[in-house]
């Protein structure tokens, strides 16, 4: 430490000022590259994520209008006497959906599906409601990164309104 102090005192006034300015510039660079730049990059990432999620929500809202409502149901009654779990298992195969978990709960069933095409999911739910009197109680879906139109159905609660 004494050696540094001696070197400092051996410098001319102009050299000392130059060293102080260089230290200040170095400190500003460290603050910018260690704190400000990463923060700005994260902020940009957050904005892009929000924009992408908003686009997904808008797309889902547009697609939701194509789902028929329950009071419009006028399908055939051919499968109304089939139990809800069997109906779910059979109908998901027709739409290329994969059941990961199916838990019957009286007239309701909790379903978890694998990654699914959103349009196929909507058509399947529409058919269940129109032809079989099955209503969606709750639905939790997440968009799959880098796969447009593909969703993860983490929780789907279905209820048969006219249990045979």
UniProtKB/Swiss-Prot annotation:
Positions on the Cytoplasmic side per record topology: 1-17
InterPro entries, sorted: T2SS_GspM (IPR007690), T2SS_M_periplasmic_sf (IPR023229)
GO CC terms of this entry: plasma membrane; type II protein secretion system complex
Coarse class of the protein's main subcellular location: membrane
Record-annotated membrane-spanning stretches: 18-38
Periplasmic membrane side: 39-164
A GO biological process held by the record: protein secretion by the type II secretion system
Subcellular location: Cell inner membrane
Job description of the protein: Inner membrane component of the type II secretion system required for the energy-dependent secretion of extracellular factors such as proteases and toxins from the periplasm. Plays a role in the complex assembly and recruits OutL resulting in a stable complex in the inner membrane. Provides thus a link between the energy-providing OutE protein in the cytoplasm and the rest of the T2SS machinery.
Designated name of the protein: Type II secretion system protein M
Native source species: Pectobacterium carotovorum subsp. carotovorum (Erwinia carotovora subsp. carotovora)
């Amino acid at each position: 430490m004494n050696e540094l102090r001696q070197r400092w005192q051996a410098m001319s006034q102009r050299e000392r000022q130059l060293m102080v300015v260089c230290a200040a510039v170095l400190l500003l660079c460290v603050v910018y590259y260690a704190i400000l730049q990463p923060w700005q990059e994260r902020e940009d990432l957050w904005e892009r994520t929000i924009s992408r999620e908003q686009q997904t929500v808008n797309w889902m809202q547009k697609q939701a209008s194509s789902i028929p409502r329950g009071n419009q149901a006028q399908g055939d009654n051919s499968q109304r006497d089939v139990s809800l779990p069997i109906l779910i298992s059979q109908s998901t195969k027709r739409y290329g959906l994969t059941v990961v978990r199916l838990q019957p709960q009286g007239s309701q069933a909790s379903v978890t599906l694998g990654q699914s095409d959103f349009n196929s999911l909507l058509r399947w739910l529409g058919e269940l409601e129109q032809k079989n009197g099955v209503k969606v109680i709750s639905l939790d879906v997440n968009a799959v990164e880098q796969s447009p139109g593909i969703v993860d159905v983490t929780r789907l609660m279905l209820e048969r309104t006219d249990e045979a």
